[in-house]
Amino acid sequence: MIEKVVSVNKDGMRADRFVKSLSAGIGFGFLQKLFRTKKIKINGKKAEPSDKIHTGDVIKIFATLPEELQQKQENNPKLFEQLKKMIIFENDNFFAINKPSKLAVQLGSKVTFCIETLIKAYPNLQCFLVHRLDKDTSGVLLIAKNQLWARKLTGMFRDNEIKKTYLAIVDGKIKSAGTINDYIEKSFIGNEEKMCVTKNEGLQAVTHYRPLQKVGFHTLLELRPDTGRKHQLRVHCASELNAPILGDYKYNPNALGSNMFLHAYKIFIKPLGIEITAELPDYFKEQISTEEC
């Protein structure tokens, strides 16, 4: 835990800018997560990013700030080479990568290496995450090259002008297409945090699904979310279709193997007319070809 008392020269500063000033290694995503998960308090009360702080306020941060590690990764040529291998689209304003499974997008209390730290290696640019993928989900991830385009792309996601298409292999046979429209909220089952479907509480979640082919005893599904709730596709497959995603240890009680078969296959940025497709991982293609035999 870090405790700081606001000095005179910081009076009137926004809370998020104050926290960012404490460490050059704090990325935008990590900063937002600190506030979202209530890890920052002002005078004992939960802080919001836009809160104004004043002389004498006590700021407590219930996390470790990854300063030294982040500074080592900024403008690191080896890390940039690693990032370049993932890039599948790039223009002057943003780029897209094919994120591998098992690599987290954002820093966390137990995550010290992730996409957020990799993009710091991009020479002479401050890059910004504009959306997220779960650690075990692979596929298209957009990254802005400046604040202006971070705001623009974030706005397009908010206004549903960026359409996402996922591919998943699920346990069970899905015979027809359909749309799931319900509500999702966080709950705790034992000591484990999970997202659960509810009738009319929580946040609305809408997913369109379509079976593409049988894969042995499984089904290759196309999933198109209209909303971006946490674990939305995983919960909808498990709870509403009764067909949890293969390898999903959180929502599939029969999960086996080391990979989750959920891939962000395609993004269409409608206002720009840009479509970006991410090739399936080898293990995903092998699962399809093996069970077709």
Model region roles, listed by residue range:
Residues 1-190, 203, 214, 282-292:
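RNA pseudouridine synthases
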Residues 44, 271-273:
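Residue-level detection of beta-strand-connecting loop/turn positions
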Residues 191-200:
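Short aromatic-glycine motifs in intrinsically disordered, low-complexity regions
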Residues 200-205, 251:
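PP2C/PPM family metal-dependent serine/threonine protein phosphatase catalytic domain
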Residues 209:
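Long C-terminal interaction/binding lobes of large macromolecular proteins
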